């Protein structure tokens, strides 16, 4: 949900709290626990869970490798659950004409630099740039072209916008900021 008035525009940005990330985290942790249990079952010589048979798996080398993959998967799953819990990457883009300032705010990982805020002047914005790559893995990203700096992405790299939505978003923002659009 965007907010726009005559002087202010706020575009919220979704972070890592997405349904696909929840599914991947859940599947990853379940698979990792299964691998770990089968590996430990092969070490003990008996099945810890009746559904997961380890009778044909010798501890050296298969069982130890399954334990390693299971533990690595648990750590990776823990990392993914933490990014979902902290909602890393979420935030907003705020364009304030009254103050003449653009704020790009994102949440990062906990610590000293959890709040990431990039600020620059609206008068330094040269254009809105669209990067469109079609094919097997399409990529559609909006950038702010700023004088003397590299282009700043406004949308996530994995955000799946249709070409029409991308053009509408770029046109609305260019109209609000009174700049041109590049990269058709």
UniProtKB/Swiss-Prot annotation:
Upper taxonomic lineage: Eukaryota, Viridiplantae, Streptophyta, Embryophyta, Tracheophyta
Pfam families documented for this protein: Ycf4 (PF02392)
Organism of this sequence: Angiopteris evecta
NCBIfam families registered for this protein in UniProt: PRK02542.1
Transmembrane spans: 22-42, 64-84
Cellular component, GO annotation: chloroplast thylakoid membrane; photosystem I
Chief place where the protein resides: plastid
Membrane topology: Multi-pass membrane protein
Family per record: Belongs to the Ycf4 family.
InterPro entries the record matches: PSI_Ycf4_assembly
Location of the protein in the cell: Plastid, Chloroplast thylakoid membrane
Domain of life assignment: Eukaryota
GO BP annotations, alphabetical order: photosynthesis
Encoding gene per record: ycf4
Function of the molecule: Seems to be required for the assembly of the photosystem I complex.
Protein name from the UniProt record: Photosystem I assembly protein Ycf4
Alphabetical keyword list: Chloroplast, Membrane, Photosynthesis, Plastid, Thylakoid, Transmembrane, Transmembrane helix
Annotated signal sequence range: none
């Amino acid at each position: 949900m965007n907010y726009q008035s005559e002087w202010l525009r706020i575009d919220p940005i979704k972070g890592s709290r997405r349904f696909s990330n929840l599914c991947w985290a859940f599947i990853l942790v379940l698979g990792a626990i299964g691998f770990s249990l089968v590996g430990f079952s092969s070490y003990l010589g008996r099945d810890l869970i009746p559904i997961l048979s380890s009778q044909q798996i010798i501890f050296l080398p298969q069982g130890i490798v399954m334990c390693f993959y299971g533990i690595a998967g648990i750590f990776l799953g823990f990392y993914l659950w933490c990014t979902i819990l902290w909602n890393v990457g979420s935030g907003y883009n705020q364009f304030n004409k009254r103050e003449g300032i653009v704020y790009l705010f994102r949440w990062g990982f906990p610590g000293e630099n959890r709040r990431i805020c990039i600020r620059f002047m609206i008068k330094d914005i040269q254009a809105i740039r669209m990067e469109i790559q079609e094919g097997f893995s399409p990529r559609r990203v909006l950038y702010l072209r700023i004088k003397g700096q590299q282009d700043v992405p406004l949308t996530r790299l994995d955000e799946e916008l249709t070409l029409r939505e991308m053009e509408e978003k770029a046109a609305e923002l260019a109209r609000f900021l009174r700049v041109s659009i590049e990269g058709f």
